Amino acid sequence: DAQESRGLGDVYKRQPLPYELDALAPHISKETLEFHYGKHHQTYVTNLNNLIPGTEFENLSLEDIVKKSSGGIFNNAAQIWNHTFYWNSLAPKAGGAPTGKLADAINAKWGSFDAFKEAFNKSAAGNFGSGWTWLVKKADGSVDIVNTSNAATPLTTADKPLLTCDVWEHAYYIDYRNARPKYLENFWALVNWEFAAKNFA
C-alpha cells in the first residue's frame, strides 16, 4: 500500500524503501537513491509536516490531503504519494513483461508489449520539464499512458495509477546526466509488474 504511515498524534513519516539502497544498481545507483529517497523525498515529508499543523488537513490520510488540498500542501503531499508509488513501481531483478489481464489490456490498447514500451518511452521523453509518466487504468477498464507535470497525479482524476516513472531530473541526473532516454531504457529492467497487476485487479 502506498499510504504513508502516521504515528499517534504524530507527523507523516517516509515509507521505508521496499529494498536496499543499492538494490536497483546498476540501473539506478545507490548514490541516486541516497539523494532521491534520502534527501528529496524526505524534504517533501518535512515540508508537509511543517505546513499542516492547525489546518483542516492535519488529521487526514495522505490520499485525502492530495485529493482535497492545493498550493504548497498539495505539492508536498502529492510528491510524497507519487514517490512512494514510484519506489513500489520498481524492484530489483524485475522487469520482463506483464502477464494475465494487465498484459491483455496492454495488448488490446497498443497491439504488443514492445509497442506499449515505445509509446511510454516517447511520452516520458517528451514530458516537458519536471513530472511523471503513468500507466493508468481508465474507468472503462482499458489502460492508457498519462503525463503529469510537477506534483500532479492521477489520484485526483478518475484514472487509477498502475505504475509510474519519475522524470524529474533528480531521478536520473547522477546516473545519466541529462540523458532521460537512457534512463528510460534502463527503467524497464526494474519495472515491478506484480505491483502494477495488483493495482489493475
Regions found by a protein language model. Name each.
Residues 1-12:
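Single conserved hydrophobic/aromatic residue that forms the stacking wall/gate
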Residues 10-201:
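Feature for soluble, non-membrane regions of globular proteins
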